[in-house]
């Protein structure tokens, strides 16, 4: 086999072209920067984080369901419970924070006050 090595330098990047057939080729490209005058991005899905206060009486229920949330968690089950569908049940007087998750990320929080 006839190996032919050709060093090509383009735009301060050196490339080694190794040709088995004995023919090496290189193509130089123009890297002149282009200024962007106007850009618009339209997301196909906007994530809305819900952070709000929720006053409840003992025994009341309220749905904090969000279709993008994958899991719900309460920091105080004695005050407010939440099920896998986002239904909050007020258990006793006090405060609790319901955290909504999307995967492992915090999606939003609902601050429950039971009176």
Curated annotation (Swiss-Prot):
Q: Which residues form the BIG2 domain?
A: 36-114
Show the SUPFAM superfamilies listed in the entry. Invasin/intimin cell-adhesion fragments
Q: Quick check: keyword Signal in the entry?
A: yes
Induction of its expression:
Expression is induced in response to phosphate starvation in a PhoR-dependent manner.
User: What domain of life does the native source organism fall in?
Assistant: Bacteria
Q: Where is the signal peptide?
A: 1-26
**Which keywords accompany this UniProt record?**
Signal
Full protein name: Uncharacterized protein YjdB
Organism field: Bacillus subtilis (strain 168)
């Amino acid at each position: 086999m006839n190996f032919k090595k050709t060093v090509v330098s383009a735009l301060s990047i050196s490339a080694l072209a190794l040709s088995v057939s004995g023919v090496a080729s290189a193509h130089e490209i123009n890297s002149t920067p282009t200024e962007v005058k106007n850009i618009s991005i339209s997301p196909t899905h906007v994530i809305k984080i819900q952070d709000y206060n929720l006053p409840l009486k003992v025994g009341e229920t309220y749905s904090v369901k969000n279709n993008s949330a994958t899991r719900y968690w309460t920091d105080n089950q004695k005050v407010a419970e939440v099920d896998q569908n986002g239904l909050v049940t007020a258990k006793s007087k006090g405060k609790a924070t319901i955290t909504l998750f999307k995967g492992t990320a915090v999606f939003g929080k609902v601050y429950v006050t039971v009176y």
